[in-house]
Amino acid sequence: LLLSSFKPILVMKQNLKTAHYRNGDLIPQVSDNAAWNSLSTGAWCWYKNDSATYAASYGKLYNWYAVNDPRGLAPAGWHVPADTEWSTLISFLGGDPAAGGKMKEAGYVHWVSPNTEATNSSRFTGLPGHFRPFHGQFYGDFGTIGYWWSTTFDGSEGAYCIQLVYNL
């Protein structure tokens, strides 16, 4: 729970791990890169399709279609933030890049060194869960970056997101 001088800003305690929209409809798991690339509907996966390694600590990775689906990805009473809501949170925490350190889990259990300025003073406990781009291929070193969707379309091929990085 974060409190501003204007209104409370509430964030969920853990990442989403649902396989259903709010109305109960199934969100399919898609592991194949080519299938992920050709999607025009919602889907989810585990990072590198490895639930044994990543399921306990990290949430599922969802594509833009799942995030933006009118059936709702988040539980009742919750929603995926719009870009303006992320901006409000970041401003409240001191702007970019100061907010990043306040939002990242401190230490090196999940993040690689140097995990710059990580204090988790916001109690957001951002983890480096990576993401899966539209083309479906996973890349980069795990432990270095985490992404969180916004519901704000960027005008081209996706949506705005925020990212937390190990060295910023």
Where do the protein language model's features map onto the residues?
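Conserved positions within compact, well-structured domain cores
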Residues: L1-L168
